[in-house]
Amino acid sequence: MSVKGKVFKYGDNVDTDVIIPARYLNTSDANELAAHCMEDIDVDFVKNVKSGDIIVANKNFGCGSSREHAPLAIKTAGVSCVIASTFARIFYRNAINIGLPILECDEAVKNIDAGDELEVDFSTGLIKNLTKSQEYQGEAFPEFMQKIIDNDGLIGYIRNR
């Protein structure tokens, strides 16, 4: 599976409280969550994000409170994947469980800028920066995790077994 999209770039320690602020956690409606995705760190994110776009961030993306709402808001907003130097472990698992592809690749993060267009192949972990004609090698998912992503998350994976 591969995706192509424009980059929205963020720094270190983007926590779940800025991905989806706690004031919106009284709903589990994915569309309502998506309407407020990233608003405390990027007020124009929801207005500017297009289906297929990609979030790139530095280290420890998704730190803070353990909330499945955070990757769900990102995915429902139209983001096709998140690339970071590192992810908070609980966010990493929550993202996989809801079917949001994520890749760790420090080299890519250091060289990618906001607005760059990327193409990402999850089966190989290859990240192509189409704007700069550069390629970076991220770590591909193990086969069982790729199957979860391919089935739109853990629930879809279990249903289709």
From Swiss-Prot:
The keyword Amino-acid biosynthesis applies. The keyword Nucleotidyltransferase does not apply. GO terms for molecular function: 3-isopropylmalate dehydratase activity. GO terms for biological process: L-leucine biosynthetic process. Gene3D superfamilies: Aconitase, domain 4. Pathway: Amino-acid biosynthesis; L-leucine biosynthesis; L-leucine from 3-methyl-2-oxobutanoate: step 2/4. It catalyses: (2R,3S)-3-isopropylmalate = (2S)-2-isopropylmalate. It is an enzyme of class 4 (lyase). Keywords: Amino-acid biosynthesis, Branched-chain amino acid biosynthesis, Leucine biosynthesis, Lyase. Pfam families: Aconitase_C. Its EC number is 4.2.1.33. Catalyzes the isomerization between 2-isopropylmalate and 3-isopropylmalate, via the formation of 2-isopropylmaleate. Belongs to the LeuD family. LeuD type 2 subfamily. Heterodimer of LeuC and LeuD. This is 3-isopropylmalate dehydratase small subunit. It comes from Clostridium beijerinckii (strain ATCC 51743 / NCIMB 8052). The lineage of its organism: Bacteria, Bacillati, Bacillota, Clostridia, Eubacteriales.
